[in-house]
Amino acid sequence: MARLKEIYWKEIAPKLKEELKLSNVMEVPRVTKITLNMGLGEAVGDKKVIEHAVADLEKITGQKVVVTYARKSIAGFKVREGWPIGVKVTLRRERMYEFLDRLLSISLPRVRDFRGLNAKSFDGRGNYSMGVKEQIIFPEIDYDKIDALRGLDITLTTTAKNDDEGRALLRAFKFPFRN
């Protein structure tokens, strides 16, 4: 079992049950999935960009990546319908907890000038989104082998009913919020 999953069920869930005054341990909010997305606008001019992004995201997550395609043509962005414009991957269960563990203990401390995560990045339903400016904060990425610095979006989907429950859950996981 993943280290964070064990910590969640043995320590975090009982503590949150009391804190949120819930009657059943199954009502306690939990993380259901983590979605990583790389929007690649520069892929319009160079098709190799998608290949490099797929390789990077597969190294980071250890899972097969899905290429996303443009739904409709937008002349202003020089994008045609059906062109590849991004990559994404959804992590659940064990891999999700392992990724979350690596993100909190290894990757976030490697961010330059890191002052904490914005505590206001919740969506109103207890889900949290954050952006990473460079993929090199992940230990799986070798700095010498990358072609360009790319950012990615990380979204944590939870079963929390509102932002306060979601915030309590992520604080229990020791998320480094700045405010």
Curated annotation (Swiss-Prot):
GO molecular-function terms, A-Z: rRNA binding; structural constituent of ribosome; tRNA binding
GO biological process, one term: translation
Alphabetic keyword roster: Ribonucleoprotein, Ribosomal protein, RNA-binding, rRNA-binding, tRNA-binding
InterPro entries the record matches: Ribosomal_uL5 (IPR002132), Ribosomal_uL5_bac-type (IPR020930), Ribosomal_uL5_C (IPR031309), Ribosomal_uL5_CS (IPR020929), Ribosomal_uL5_dom_sf (IPR022803), Ribosomal_uL5_N (IPR031310)
Amino-acid biosynthesis listed as a keyword: no
Gene3D superfamilies reported in the protein's UniProt record: 3.30.1440.10
Organism superkingdom: Bacteria
One Gene Ontology CC term in the entry: ribonucleoprotein complex
Summary of subunit composition and partner proteins: Part of the 50S ribosomal subunit; part of the 5S rRNA/L5/L18/L25 subcomplex. Contacts the 5S rRNA and the P site tRNA. Forms a bridge to the 30S subunit in the 70S ribosome.
Role description: This is one of the proteins that bind and probably mediate the attachment of the 5S RNA into the large ribosomal subunit, where it forms part of the central protuberance. In the 70S ribosome it contacts protein S13 of the 30S subunit (bridge B1b), connecting the 2 subunits; this bridge is implicated in subunit movement. Contacts the P site tRNA; the 5S rRNA and some of its associated proteins might help stabilize positioning of ribosome-bound tRNAs.
UniProt record similarity statement: Belongs to the universal ribosomal protein uL5 family.
NCBIfam families noted in UniProt: PRK00010.1
Protein name in the entry: Large ribosomal subunit protein uL5
Organism: Pseudomonas fluorescens (strain SBW25)
